[in-house]
Amino acid sequence: MIFVNSGAGLQTWAGFSAYSASKYALTALADALRAEERGTVRVTSLHPGRVATDMQVELSALQGRPYRAADYLDPAEVARAVRLAVELAPGASAESIRLS
């Protein structure tokens, strides 16, 4: 099971309290499921930093700054991290992957 979370599930910033709270809750859910299903289901929390998505385009506009895709993670990097977690050898696990 892969939870695509956010860097906000590991760290919080002023002005993003509700968003961070929801991401910390997702981290806790993944941790609880991992403990409950240990040995039967692998649970990975993926915490990408800022990814080049429409959300970042909108945030840039709201903050009055230009959007530059080069400043963000390529979505393909997130996909590669998911694939890495899925293709681990039996018995191996990646409890948390952080991309920045």
Predicted regions and their residues:
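Rossmann-fold scaffold of SDR-type NAD(P)-dependent oxidoreductases
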Residues: F3, T44
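Residue(s) in the substrate-gating loop at a strand-loop-helix junction
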Residues: S6
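Active-site-adjacent segment of SDR/Rossmann-fold oxidoreductases
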Residues: Q11, A32-V41
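Active-site loop immediately N-terminal to the catalytic Tyr-X3-Lys motif
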Residues: Q11-S17
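Active-site helix of classical SDR
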Residues: S22
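Short beta-loop-alpha junction of Rossmann-like oxidoreductase domains
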Residues: V41, R50-L59
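C-terminal helical subdomain
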Residues: S45-L46, P66-S100
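Short glycine/proline- and charge-enriched loop/turn segments
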Residues: V57-Y67
